[in-house]
Amino acid sequence: MKRIFLFLATNLAIIVVLSIVLRLLGVERILDESGTNLNLNALLIFAAVFGFGGSFISLAISKWMAKKTMRVHVIEQPRNSTEQWLLETVRRQAREAGIGMPEVGIFNSPDPNAFATGMSKNNALVAVSTGLMDRMNADEVEAVLGHEVAHVANGDMVTLALIQGVVNTFVIFLARVVGHFVDRVVFKNEQGHGPAFWITTIVAEIVFAILASIIVMWFSRQREFRADAGGARLAGREKMISALEKLRAVHTPSQMPDQMAAFGIRGGMGQGLKKLFMSHPPLEERIMALKAMQR
C-alpha cells in the first residue's frame, strides 16, 4: 500500500525532465504551427505519448524503486520461522486470490506499515515493516498481508497507471496551452516560443499536476476500501478490523520518507482541504465500512 506518493512523485519528475530535454532538443517546435498558432492535434498526440509514457515508466520501475527506497530484504530462503510463516501466508493468499506468488520482503522501520507494488498481478512485491511484525499478532499481520495481496489481485497499480496517464496527458496539454497564451498575449511574442512559454509551461505543469493529484487520491481512497474488503475475505473480517484498530491506536509519527508516507497501510490524518490529498480514508471510516459488511 506504499505506492501512491512515490508513483506520483516519479511521474511529476519524469514529466518535468522530459519537458526540459524536449525543449533543449527543439522537439517542441512541432507544436508551434507556422510560428503563430499551436497545432492542437499534434499537441494532443504529443501529450498522450509522453503522459502515458511517464506513467508506465513509473509503473515499470515501481518495484525496484520501492526496494531501494525502503531497503527491503526480499525473502528468498527463510532464515527463521517468522519469515517462513510470511512466505506461506502470502503464498496461500495469492493462490486464493488467483495471482502469481509475489516477492515477499521485510523492511526495517519501527513504524507499523506494509505495502504492495509491482508491474502486474504476477510480478509484484509485498513487504511488511519490522514495526508491524513487533506490534501485531499473527491474525492481524495475516489481515494486513491479505489487504496487500488484494491490492495486487485488484490490479490497482495498473489501473492507477492508466488514470495517471490520462491525468498526465491533460497536464501536459493544458500547460502548453497556457504557456502559449502567456507567450503570445502577455509578452507579445509573435514568432516561435520565447522564454515566457518555457517558464510558464514548467510552472503550469507543476501546479496542474498538484491539482490533478486530487483525482488520483480520490481514486486511491476508493481502492483502499476495496482492498480492506479483499483482506477481510482472505483473512477474515474480524482480523481485518482488529488490524485497523491496532493501527488507529498507534500515535507515533510515521518514520517513512515523506514521498513514501501515503503508500503505507496506516495512511494519514487530515481535515478540510488536506483530506483531498490523502491517499487513504480515515481509519475510522475504514473500520465502519468493514463492520457494515455482511457476515
Swiss-Prot record:
Keyword Nucleus: no
Residues the record lists as binding Zn(2+): 147, 151, 224
Entry membrane topology: Multi-pass membrane protein
InterPro entries: HtpX_protease, Pept_M48_protease_HtpX, Peptidase_M48
Gene Ontology molecular function: any one: zinc ion binding
Predominant subcellular localization, coarse grouping: membrane
EC number annotated for this UniProt entry: 3.4.24.-
A single GO cellular-component term on record: plasma membrane
Entry similarity comment: Belongs to the peptidase M48B family.
Protein name in the entry: Protease HtpX
Source organism: Thioalkalivibrio sulfidiphilus (strain HL-EbGR7)
Lineage: Bacteria, Pseudomonadati, Pseudomonadota, Gammaproteobacteria, Chromatiales
